[in-house]
């Protein structure tokens, strides 16, 4: 997009508030409906409004069978994954229920940071995005009482990928709706170039994800579990963290650029990392239509030394995904320096994210031809796979 258009809302385009009216006839000349707060930057106020927003819905495509009660559904299974990581009923994760920490920088700018916090297992990774019936029925094959993960079972792989996608989709949907409500209350926000850029990004992301949701919806209704290409990495032992993500990594295991964007459309992976009693898994899935994008990457992951694969995910996951659940056993095993580094990386966004993403590329470049030396205690500052 032309930089001028990226940072500016034009009169004839639809108003960002979602009214369906032209911007010039809607929010352009409207006054804010509440008093300005000059003590805090508009970006900080916007972040707090977004975090406080709630939205209840059922994202299953069969609306005819929905019930009224929308439950706190778990993105990662409480009784099979989170409970395995927990100590005294708690795990560590980013707690977006609390206000962000506001940090002034040396340049006089403001950064926000969400701290890791102990969260009860019944609240960890929950979202109000499924009704009682659909949450219970759709994911029954991987929930409590179901057999252990079977890497030859297409239904298992589909359900993990679908969960990773749909819970990330819900988060973006909440962001979009909260942003629209914020614009209705405070149209002056659109005078911020940063907020206009955010609006452009979230709008494009929703268009991309709506297309993928339509594909998952059709597959869910037809019980068609063959729409995905899945890379399964089995790791000996039970790891101390879990993760779900819908992301598009920029670099592969050998620092080559992954061409994940074509014609302006990003093609994402649906990732789940989880422990079982005596083994753990990393699942990476993409739509079959995207298999050419990730074919070489999948091949690298399945043929490389498992410790080098761990090193890659140690670098990539904290940078790309905020949905990492840490066992208290792992968190307390880390030094304060490691805890601080993890918190820093998982909060990166904007320019700083781009800088450290490039740093990840150089880190992988330096060990491109290295096949050993990635054992426990040798992989780097953040060791998600450390034995505790």
Which residue stretches match the model-derived regions?
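Metal-centered catalytic cores of metalloenzymes
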Residues: 40-47, 52-55, 119, 182, ...
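Internal, well-ordered alpha/beta segment that forms a basic, Gly-enriched binding/recognition surface
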Residues: 89-200
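Extracellular repeat turn/loop positions enriched in glycine and acidic/polar residues, especially those
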Residues: 18-20
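Charge-dense, low-complexity intrinsically disordered regions
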Residues: 202-388
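Extracellular cysteine-rich, disulfide-stabilized repeat modules
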Residues: 13-16
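Pre-Walker A adenine-sensing motif
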Residues: 2-3
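An N-terminal structural lobe/cap that precedes and organizes the functional/catalytic core
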Residues: 6-11, 28-135, 140-141
